[in-house]
Amino acid sequence: MVARLGPPSPAGAVYRVPDSREGWVEALCKLTDLAEDGGGEITFDVSDVRPRGSIIHGFGGVASGPGPLIEMLANVADVLNGCVGRPYTPLDLMEVDHAIAAAVIAGGVRRSARMSTLPWRDEANIFRFISCKSDPAHHWSTNISVAVDADFFEALDAGDSHARAVLEEVATGMAVNGEPGLVNMSLAQVGETSTDLVPNPCAEIFLEAFEPCCLGHLNLA
């Protein structure tokens, strides 16, 4: 496949995608690097990727073939092209993440789980975020929760209009499809030494970057 980012440009590099998880990741990195470098054209040769239905001996399950990879690269390119000339928004990045997750899920085995959160103070994006799953065709690969804190509840008690509007929209969404949830970042910090914490996909536990999601101690408790 050929991916073009930005205005028309001469033919660019060719990347022959290896038949491995690392190869798929590298293909995505080459696409996003191209966007960061100002755009251009790149061709992805997927002839080495094993066909759909092949057994995956190491991980288990069956291969999804090159189709989901091509679709993911095309969808990410569409998102990046839509951002030319402006900063990325949280919803743009969620679209990229969703495209990646959809490619990972393909193959008949549950291989991807996501949680997306956005701070309640982000007035520019929070209401679009809250309603982003109202269309079942979008963002079905992620759970979504609004990140609140002690200030949020104090603002509610003080009658703050933005905090009240956020809570009302959250409640409306919950009544329709159960989302978004609320994650209390102030409570998540109790007893923790790091301020850079994010919830796991089901929000049972808060983790630092690259920390393994082990729920054994929660289950034992």
Task: Please provide the spans of the model-predicted regions.
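Function-dense linear segments that define catalytic or interfacial modules
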Residues: 1-72, 173-221
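Conserved, charged catalytic cores of large soluble enzymes
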Residues: 67, 71-83, 91, 95, ...
